[in-house]
C-alpha cells in the first residue's frame, strides 16, 4: 500500500515537473517572440511612413511647392523663404499665359535674310542710300534745308533762317581786341513771332503795363462754345497776318484761357465766351462779343488804332470806352 502510494506519488512527480518545464518554455518563447514581432511592426511602420513621405514630396514638387526634408521641422531662414517659388492657381497661370501670348502677337514677325548674296545686296543698297562719309565738294549734296539725306528739320521745328553778315575792318579790329560785334549773326525769327501769345495771370501786369501801346485780348473757354472760340482765334490770327502781308505794324494780341486763369477773367469782367477786348493806353476802349471775319476785325483795328474809316459793323458810340485795365499784382 505504501509502495503503491509511493509509486503513485513518484509517477505524479514527473508529470508535474514536465508540466512545469513545458509551461516555462512556453513563457520564455512567448517573451522572445513578442519583441521580435514588435520590432517587425516598427520596421514596417517606418517603411510605410517613408513611402508616404516620398509620395508627398513628389506631389509637392509637381504642384510647385517645396518639399520639406525630414529634419526641416525647425524654423526656416528668410533666404529660404525668398527662394521659395510663388504658388499660382490655375486661373492665374492661364491669365499669365494669355498675356504672354498677347504680347508676342503684338510683335510682327520679321523674316531674316539668310542668303549671303541677298544680304550683301541689301547692305550695298543701304550704303548707297545713306552714305556714311560725304565729301564737302560733292556736287550731289542737297542744297535744300535738310539735315543729311532724307530728313528735314522742318518736319519737327519751324524753319530757322540765320544770315551771316560780312565784317568790316573795324569789326575785325574789335574782335582782335576782344570786343565782340553785335552784328555777327542776324536772326530772322519772323517765324517765331506768334500772332497771338497766351498770357497767364502772373505775366499780365508786365504784358499790359510795360507797353501802353495797342493791345487786343482774346478771352476764350475751351468748354463753352468751343467751336466759336476756336474760330475766333483763327480769324484773329488771319487779321494780324494781313497787317504783316502789307508790311504794316500790327497791334499786339494775347489770349487768356478762362479755365486756367479764372481770377484774371473775373477781373476783366468777362462772362460770355469768346470775347475780344480792344485796349489802348491802359484802357478798354471796346468789347466785342461777336465772332467776326478776319477782314472785319482788321478794319476795327485800323479804326481804333490807326484812325482809319469807321467800319459798318461799328456804331458811333463804339470805341469810346474809358474802363481801366485791371491790375493783378
From Swiss-Prot:
GO annotation, cellular component aspect: chloroplast stroma
Region (Disordered): 58-91
Compositional bias annotation for Acidic residues: 72-85
One GO BP annotation of this record: chloroplast organization
Keyword Plastid: yes
Assigned keywords, A-Z: Chloroplast, Plastid, Transit peptide
Transit peptide: 1-46
Principal location listed in the UniProt entry: plastid
InterPro entries according to UniProt: MRL7/MRL7L (IPR044701)
Locations listed in the record: Plastid, Chloroplast stroma
PANTHER family from the UniProt entry: THIOREDOXIN-LIKE FOLD DOMAIN-CONTAINING PROTEIN MRL7L, CHLOROPLASTIC
Function: Plays an essential role in early steps of chloroplast development. Involved in the regulation of plastid gene expression. Required for the proper function of the plastid transcriptional machinery and protein accumulation in thylakoid membranes. May function as molecular chaperone to ensure proper organization of the nucleoids in chloroplasts.
Protein name (database record): Thioredoxin-like fold domain-containing protein MRL7L homolog, chloroplastic
Organism: Oryza sativa subsp. japonica
Lineage per the UniProt record: Eukaryota, Viridiplantae, Streptophyta, Embryophyta, Tracheophyta
Amino acid at each position: 500500500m505504501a509502495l503503491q502510494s509511493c509509486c503513485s506519488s513518484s509517477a505524479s512527480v514527473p508529470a508535474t515537473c514536465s508540466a512545469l518545464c513545458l509551461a516555462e518554455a512556453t513563457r520564455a518563447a512567448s517573451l522572445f517572440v513578442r519583441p521580435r514581432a514588435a520590432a517587425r511592426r516598427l520596421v514596417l511602420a517606418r517603411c510605410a511612413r517613408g513611402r508616404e513621405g516620398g509620395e508627398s514630396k513628389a506631389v509637392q514638387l509637381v504642384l510647385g511647392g517645396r518639399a520639406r526634408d525630414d529634419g526641416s521641422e525647425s524654423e526656416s531662414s528668410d533666404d529660404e523663404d525668398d527662394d521659395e517659388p510663388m504658388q499660382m492657381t490655375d486661373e492665374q497661370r492661364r491669365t499669365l499665359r494669355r498675356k504672354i501670348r498677347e504680347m508676342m502677337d503684338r510683335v510682327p514677325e520679321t523674316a531674316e535674310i539668310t542668303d549671303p548674296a541677298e544680304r550683301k545686296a541689301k547692305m550695298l543698297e543701304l550704303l548707297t542710300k545713306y552714305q556714311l562719309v560725304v565729301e564737302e565738294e560733292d556736287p550731289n549734296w542737297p542744297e535744300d534745308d535738310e539735315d543729311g539725306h532724307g530728313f528735314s528739320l522742318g518736319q519737327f521745328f519751324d524753319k530757322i533762317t540765320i544770315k551771316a553778315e560780312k565784317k568790316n575792318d573795324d569789326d575785325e579790329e574789335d574782335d582782335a581786341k576782344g570786343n565782340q560785334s553785335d552784328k555777327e549773326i542776324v536772326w530772322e525769327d519772323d517765324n517765331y513771332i506768334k500772332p497771338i501769345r497766351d498770357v497767364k495771370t502772373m505775366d499780365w501786369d508786365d504784358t499790359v503795363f510795360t507797353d501802353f501801346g495797342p493791345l487786343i485780348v482774346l478771352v476764350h473757354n475751351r468748354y463753352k462754345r468751343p467751336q466759336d472760340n476756336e474760330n475766333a482765334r483763327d480769324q484773329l490770327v488771319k487779321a494780324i497776318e494781313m497787317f504783316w502781308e502789307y508790311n504794316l505794324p500790327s497791334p499786339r494780341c494775347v489770349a487768356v484761357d478762362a479755365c486756367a486763369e479764372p481770377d484774371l477773367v473775373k477781373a476783366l469782367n468777362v462772362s460770355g465766351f469768346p470775347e475780344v477786348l480792344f485796349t489802348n493806353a491802359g484802357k478798354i476802349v471796346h468789347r466785342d462779343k461777336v465772332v467776326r471775319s478776319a477782314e472785319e476785325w482788321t478794319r476795327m483795328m485800323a479804326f481804333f488804332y490807326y484812325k482809319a474809316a469807321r467800319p459798318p459793323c461799328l456804331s458811333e458810340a463804339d470805341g469810346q470806352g474809358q474802363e481801366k485795365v485791371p491790375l493783378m499784382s
